[in-house]
């Protein structure tokens, strides 16, 4: 894994101003921060939001976002070139070129597309070009699009084997309570494990102009830490926010430590990039074999299945109490489940999800 590689995601409320247009001042400051790190030997990938909001402002729509899918896709097509032009200008002032990379769910769920995307990003970085990533909103299927760039940023961090993921946003980090409602809320500076209490701290987006919010950032941090990526949620409009995040400046943002046992790139891809198409329920004996002995899932331990999955599809594995305990790629389809191979999911294609 590259030890000095970071993916930085910048939210809509940070890259746009009060009118909804691109905030060139913020982009200029961030570009300077990125280039400073590059000169110190860091590889940087930028994931940017803001195309929809910028496009909506360009066509006279005002600050609030539209809600119907067709309009969202249309204004994204208007805003994306505005956003890229602003990023290009910001980095050009630093003497650095940028390259646009538009990604869709298929680029992560299809193994071939996944590898092509990785090669493209690697080639851009080898040329000294900063990749600027966004979801391909203009043509994405409304039913399968990610809808927020926090998850994309976590997947990109896995894709490029980054050591760090920095989510720059309109808050100071994760607080003990909603600071808008509780004046006694304090910043949580470090998180070492995810639990229900932590996830309950997520609220809605403060700005109201993006599609993310703290819940999506926590989900992205959860994904990234499973991939062995140190993650930081920090304020975008602070001075040198990316450098401060990587330096772990005291009192700046919230840092999420990675799990001690990081997933391999392939297993992280199975766990987080591929959508499940069904479920397979197992008994207690099978659960013990998976969690304590590292075995493959055999048909004898299966108590039922749902969905229309085919050979090679991803499914959620449910324990005796109905909880998701693992995820994997099946070796037999739902239609011929009882007649196929005794191995339902090989251990090389299985990711356990209950280990701390």
Where are these regions (language model features)?
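C-terminal catalytic "cap/lid" subdomain
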Residues: 1-97, 101-356
């Amino acid at each position: 894994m590259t030890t000095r590689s970071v993916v930085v995601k910048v939210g809509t409320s940070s890259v746009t101003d009060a009118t909804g247009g691109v905030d060139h001042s913020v982009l200029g400051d961030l570009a300077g921060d990125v280039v400073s790190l590059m000169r110190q030997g860091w590889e940087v990938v930028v994931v940017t939001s803001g195309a929809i909001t910028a496009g909506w402002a360009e066509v006279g729509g005002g600050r609030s976002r539209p809600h119907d899918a067709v309009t969202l896709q249309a204004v994204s097509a208007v805003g994306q070139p505005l956003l890229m032009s602003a990023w290009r200008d910001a980095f050009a002032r630093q003497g650095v070129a940028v390259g646009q990379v538009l990604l869709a769910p298929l680029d992560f769920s299809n193994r071939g597309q996944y590898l092509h995307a990785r090669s493209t990003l690697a080639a851009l970085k080898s040329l000294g070009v900063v990749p600027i990533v966004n979801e391909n909103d203009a043509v994405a299927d409304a039913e399968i699009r990610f809808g927020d760039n926090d998850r994309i940023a976590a997947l990109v961090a896995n894709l490029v084997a980054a050591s760090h993921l920095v989510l720059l946003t309109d808050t100071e980090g994760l607080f003990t309570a909603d600071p808008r409602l509780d004046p006694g809320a304090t910043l949580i500076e470090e998180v070492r494990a995810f639990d229900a209490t932590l996830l309950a701290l997520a609220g809605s987006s403060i700005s109201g102009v993006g599609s993310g919010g703290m819940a999506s950032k926590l989900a992205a941090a959860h994904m990234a830490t499973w991939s062995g990526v140190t993650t930081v949620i920090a304020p975008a409009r602070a001075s040198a926010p990316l450098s401060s995040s990587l330096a772990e400046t005291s009192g700046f943002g919230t840092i999420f430590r990675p799990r001690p046992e990081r997933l391999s790139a392939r297993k992280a891809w199975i766990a987080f990039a591929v959508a499940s198409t069904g479920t397979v329920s197992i008994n207690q004996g099978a659960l013990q074999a998976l969690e304590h002995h590292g075995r493959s899932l055999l048909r004898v331990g299966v108590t039922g299945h749902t969905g229309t999955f085919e050979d090679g599809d991803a499914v959620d594995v449910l324990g005796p109490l109905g909880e998701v305990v693992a995820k994997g790629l099946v070796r037999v389809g739902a239609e011929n489940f009882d007649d196929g191979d005794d191995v339902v999911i090989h251990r090389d294609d299985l990711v356990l999800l209950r280990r701390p």
